[in-house]
């Protein structure tokens, strides 16, 4: 990233006043190491250490940065996660770039002139002398050290170890690290786009670990996410090929949006009347309705991209968690090219049949069963079948 582009990126991303990271991480600035540069001054910067430590506003900021970088990418300037990390570092730390890099200086002396962002616009009005006193440099070599990934080896003499850094934002793209498992939108209020009154409706998002999800709600959400992913990937390919008309692109984009809205309508519950199975009493509260993926989908059409991305982060994190919790259920099977892959309906039907046979449950009972209990039962059956197969092979 060129210095001019870098400054433009940081200045174009405004930081909400209420966004503040959650954990302190003291960083040593160059002028602390060399008192000749400036008088010694300690500055404690706060950066989140994981996805789950990010507030909803911070997750949306990450999404906006990623979406902007994706839009700016082209054949000669591919998407680079390092640019995302640089922007996130300055925004999370509450640092504003006052002056860019002077490329005429030696590389080790090139730096950004920065200052800490103030909580209100009124406090930003200072005299030139005050501005000069509160500015500080961040050198390129410092930024490179802070954002270069940590080593994956303990060999201190290896090239990887010698080239490693502090890796302060490794969690942004570290597949082996902690994933987002906290749903970013516990509650959501949306306006009904249909009808004359256009009333707002309150929705409740998934609880921790999707507690309360039935097997049917989980399967619907999983299948709709698979459908969305397939349609979205096809849309990207269609745009890259350049052989489709604008009408065809628009039609595919509408299909993607429809699949996304149906997924959101499935995981967000609204207040409805239902019979509490524990008390057998009629209750009006947030509850799952088997038809909500269809009836509520129009309300979730054209859902903002910067809010959709955190939900994608969460779903990815949940699937990673479940795959580790139930490894046999989520085990990747080798594909047989002679056989056609199973459809979601076939998988759903096979699961119902298995539960009916081995657990003695009806289809409705399986659908209303907690998704985690069904996965536990399937995990146990899959493990037993694998052990039996290993015995037969011996």
Kindly give the residue locations of the regions a language model identified.
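An amphipathic, hydrophobic-aromatic interaction surface with interspersed Lys/Arg
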Residues: 3-394
């Amino acid at each position: 990233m060129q210095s001019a582009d870098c400054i433009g990126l940081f200045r174009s991303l405004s930081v909400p006043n209420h966004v503040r990271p959650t954990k302190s991480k003291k960083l040593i600035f160059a002028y602390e190491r060399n008192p000749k540069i400036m008088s010694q001054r300690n500055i404690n910067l706060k950066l989140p250490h994981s996805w789950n430590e990010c507030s909803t506003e911070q997750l949306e900021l990450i999404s906006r940065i990623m979406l902007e970088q994706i839009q700016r990418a082209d054949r000669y300037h591919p998407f680079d996660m390092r640019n995302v990390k640089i922007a996130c570092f300055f925004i999370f730390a509450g640092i504003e770039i006052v002056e860019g890099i002077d490329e005429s200086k030696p590389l080790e002396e090139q730096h950004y002139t920065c200052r800490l962002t103030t909580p209100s616009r009124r406090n930003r009005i200072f005299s030139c002398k005050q501005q000069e006193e509160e500015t500080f440099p961040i050198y390129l070599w410092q930024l490179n050290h802070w954002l270069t990934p940590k080593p994956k080896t303990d060999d201190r003499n290896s090239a990887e170890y010698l080239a490693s850094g502090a890796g302060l934002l490794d969690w942004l793209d570290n597949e082996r690290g902690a994933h987002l498992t906290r749903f970013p939108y516990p509650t959501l209020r949306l306006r009904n786009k249909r009808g004359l009154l256009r009333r707002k409706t309150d929705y409740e998002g998934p609880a921790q670990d999707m507690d309360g999800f039935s097997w049917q709600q989980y399967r619907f959400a999983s299948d709709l996410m698979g459908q969305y992913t397939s349609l979205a990937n096809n849309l990207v390919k269609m745009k890259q090929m350049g052989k489709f008309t604008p009408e065809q692109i628009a039609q595919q984009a509408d299909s993607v949006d429809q699949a996304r809205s149906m997924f959101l309508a499935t995981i967000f519950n609204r207040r409805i009347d239902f019979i509490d199975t524990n008390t057998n009493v009629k209750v009006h509260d947030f509850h799952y309705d088997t038809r909500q993926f269809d009836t509520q989908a129009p309300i979730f059409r054209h859902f903002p991209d910067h809010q959709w991305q955190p939900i994608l982060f969460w779903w990815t994190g949940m699937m990673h968690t479940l795959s580790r919790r139930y490894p046999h259920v989520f085990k990747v099977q080798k594909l047989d090219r002679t056989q056609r892959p199973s459809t979601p309906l076939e998988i759903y039907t096979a699961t119902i049949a298995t539960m009916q046979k081995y657990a003695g449950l009806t289809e409705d009972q399986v659908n209303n069963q907690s998704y985690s209990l069904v996965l536990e039962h399937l995990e146990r059956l899959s493990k037993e079948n694998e052990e039996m197969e290993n015995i037969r092979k011996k």
